[in-house]
């Protein structure tokens, strides 16, 4: 299979899975394994196409991101979504990522560990659906600092490949009495700084694997993931309120079973 086709396929996978509760990292590892596209070059490629998904969220939520630069609501202690909410949502995952980054990259980026993460994340999502109570926050401006921190702590689970950042944070939001839409939007916003930081760190460590010859492949993957992520996020927000997390959880379990039976055994 040509590099361009591989880039196109993985770009679609990244764009679809990055902000859906199905684990983009897990899917990239599993699909990369099936395509025979693995190793350091593959890891560097994954970093680049994640930037495409990051750019999609930055554009979709640019007004909200710009508003976070206004510190007046924070200084006046207004009950309005502000930068401190984002800090509380990001800080736990940053600490966990810095402490565990090398261990995770060395030992956990394997197909069998992803299968475990897919199932564990699915169990959390089903648990959140069963145990969720009536929401008290229906918009980002309703979000309390305690709810933001709770969601941030759940984001730490996403350092394990296959668990899913969106799945973890949206589940945490439901358990903290945040509705689907608000939990999803907050999940997207706190994913940005974490992804930028993690991607930047990975890029610094992987830049030696970049080659001028790889530019066409990387460009196709980047552009594809950007376009697909834009479409996926808009569609997901509309879909989630109708169907909830359970269908995504069942898909994760089915994928884990099929991959184990047909590939790992």
Curated annotation (Swiss-Prot):
GO cellular component: plasma membrane
Keywords: Antibiotic resistance, Cell membrane, Cell shape, Cell wall biogenesis/degradation, Hydrolase, Membrane, Peptidoglycan synthesis, Transmembrane, Transmembrane helix
Membrane topology field: Multi-pass membrane protein
Keyword hit for Cell wall biogenesis/degradation: yes
UniProt keyword Cell wall biogenesis/degradation present: yes
Transmembrane segments: 4-24, 42-62, 84-104, 108-128, 184-204, 217-237, 245-265
GO molecular function (one): undecaprenyl-diphosphatase activity
InterPro entries on file: UppP
Organism the protein comes from: Bacillus anthracis
Signal sequence interval, chain numbering: none
One matching Pfam family: BacA
Protein known as: Undecaprenyl-diphosphatase 1
GO biological process, one term: cell wall organization
Domain of life, per lineage: Bacteria
Record localization: Cell membrane
Main location, first listed in the record: membrane
Record-stated family: Belongs to the UppP family.
Enzyme class: hydrolase
Misc: Bacitracin is thought to be involved in the inhibition of peptidoglycan synthesis by sequestering undecaprenyl diphosphate, thereby reducing the pool of lipid carrier available.
Catalytic activity, as annotated: di-trans,octa-cis-undecaprenyl diphosphate + H2O = di-trans,octa-cis-undecaprenyl phosphate + phosphate + H(+)
EC number: 3.6.1.27
Biological role stated in the UniProt entry: Catalyzes the dephosphorylation of undecaprenyl diphosphate (UPP). Confers resistance to bacitracin.
């Amino acid at each position: 299979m040509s590099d361009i086709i591989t880039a196109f396929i993985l770009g679609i996978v990244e764009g679809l899975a990055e902000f859906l509760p199905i684990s983009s990292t897990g899917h990239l590892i599993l699909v990369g394994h099936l395509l025979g596209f693995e190793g350091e070059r593959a890891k560097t490629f994954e970093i680049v196409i994640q930037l495409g998904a990051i750019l999609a969220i930055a554009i979709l939520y640019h007004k909200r991101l710009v508003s976070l630069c206004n510190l007046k609501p924070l200084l006046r202690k207004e009950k309005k979504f502000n930068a401190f909410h984002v800090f509380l949502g990001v800080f736990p995952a940053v600490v966990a990522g810095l402490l565990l980054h090398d261990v995770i990259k060395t030992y956990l980026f394997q197909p069998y560990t992803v299968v475990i993460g897919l199932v564990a994340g699915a169990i959390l999502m089903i648990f959140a659906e069963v145990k969720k109570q009536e929401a008290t926050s229906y918009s980002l401006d309703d979000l309390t600092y305690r709810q933001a921190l709770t969601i941030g702590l759940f984001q730490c689970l996403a350092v394990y490949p296959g668990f899913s950042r969106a799945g973890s944070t949206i589940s945490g939001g439901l358990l903290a009495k945040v509705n689907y839409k608000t939990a999803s939007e907050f999940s997207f916003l706190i994913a940005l700084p974490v992804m930028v930081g993690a991607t930047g760190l990975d890029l610094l460590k992987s830049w030696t694997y970049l080659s001028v010859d790889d530019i066409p492949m990387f460009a196709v993957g980047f552009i594809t993931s950007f376009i697909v992520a834009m479409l996926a996020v808009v569609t997901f927000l509309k879909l989630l309120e109708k169907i909830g997390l359970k269908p995504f959880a069942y898909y994760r379990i089915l994928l884990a079973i099929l991959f184990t039976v047909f590939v790992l055994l």
